[in-house]
């Protein structure tokens, strides 16, 4: 990528056009925002993306634009961040948009839908496939402006007290699962529960729920799920590349000077890259530790995957038939995904599959 193109999409173009970072000190206003996170501080990666973005914003502006991040519950509960942004309680929030599908299922596209885009594909759709424009158009009714800031990559399929051998094993299962996936699994008999990250462990421990999904090995081990559930399934087909965002109050965002907006976008881009890189760096060792401690790693049976895929497609057809806002984004999203699958199947998947086999047989060892 040429340097000019990179700077444009990283949010730095406006800053460089203005001169340089020290220019902020010459009569620039001091602006302080509060950011409500949906996540606890103990989850240093998913919470840390918001702090990384805030630090970058401060560094770029010479401390003139400061964003203070508050953990879930310090200002509002984790699942009420969008409301706090919308009503002006805080200027911005770092959250997973699919938490708010109760308002409209279309919110899910900001994070992930079952059998959707992976992390790289999501970023491509967001920046170059019309995703950013379509999603922010949808958010206008809520007075929110969204800036991409984080991704976990493909997630694990969750923790279960019993094995999932057939589709029938899903019936009656009380499971903590966020976003649109709960509606899909409900078609197969699962009883979905929406809980914030910090509330999952006690619910599993007390038996209030039978299963729970969160992110992946690094976070899951920190939260101690392996102590209260034995079976760890993969893949998390509902979250192939779930994204996090800075939800900004649109009125406050629009008041920002152009240079501060550019700094905010650059900061979020920094947080986006930092979060994905840290998860990729930390997950392998965490998975090894979990398995060494007795966790039983299991793939979902193909029959279960097939049934879930069928249920997801049915649910999408239902929503498209009755929700124009959903359909507008869904049609664009699916068309983009089809092209991505073609490309990944030709090159990316071929390479990854070969390396997985080569690594297993020792061919990749020195």
Task: Give the label of every model feature segment.
Residues 2-19, 24-122, 130, 134-366:
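N-terminal secretory/targeting leader peptides
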């Amino acid at each position: 990528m040429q340097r000019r193109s990179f700077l444009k999409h990283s949010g730095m173009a406006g800053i460089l056009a203005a001169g340089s970072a020290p220019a902020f000190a010459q009569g620039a206003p001091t602006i302080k925002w509060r950011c409500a996170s949906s996540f606890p501080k103990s989850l240093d990666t998913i919470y840390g993306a918001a702090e990384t973005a805030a630090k970058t914003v401060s560094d770029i502006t010479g401390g003139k634009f400061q964003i203070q991040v508050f953990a879930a519950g310090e200002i509002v509960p984790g699942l009420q961040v969008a409301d706090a942004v919308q009503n002006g309680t805080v200027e911005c929030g770092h959250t997973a948009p699919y938490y708010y599908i109760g308002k409209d299922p279309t919110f899910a596209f900001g994070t992930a839908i079952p059998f959707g885009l992976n992390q790289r594909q999501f970023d491509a759709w967001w920046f170059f496939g019309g995703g950013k424009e379509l999603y922010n158009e949808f958010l206008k009714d809520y007075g929110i402006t969204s800036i991409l800031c984080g991704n976990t990559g493909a997630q694990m399929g969750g923790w279960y007290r019993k094995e999932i051998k057939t589709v029938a094993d899903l019936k009656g299962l009380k499971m903590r699962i966020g976003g649109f996936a709960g509606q899909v699994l409900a078609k197969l008999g699962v009883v979905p529960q929406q809980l914030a990250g910090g509330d999952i462990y006690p619910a599993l421990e007390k038996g209030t729920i039978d299963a729970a999904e969160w992110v992946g090995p690094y976070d899951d081990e920190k939260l101690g799920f392996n102590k209260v559930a034995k079976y760890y399934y993969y893949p998390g087909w509902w979250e192939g590349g779930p994204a996090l965002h800075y939800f900004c109050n649109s009125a406050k965002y629009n008041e920002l000077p152009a240079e501060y907006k550019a700094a905010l976008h650059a900061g979020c881009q920094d947080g986006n890259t930092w979060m994905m890189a840290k998860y990729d760096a930390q997950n392998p060792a965490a998975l090894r530790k979990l398995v060494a401690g007795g966790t039983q790693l299991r793939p979902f049976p193909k029959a279960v995957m097939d049934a879930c895929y069928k249920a997801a497609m049915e649910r999408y057809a239902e929503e498209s038939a009755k929700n124009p806002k959903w359909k507008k984004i869904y049609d664009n999203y699916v068309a983009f995904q089809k092209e991505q699958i073609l490309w990944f199947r030709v090159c990316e998947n071929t390479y990854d599959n070969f390396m997985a086999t080569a690594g297993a047989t020792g061919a990749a060892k020195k």
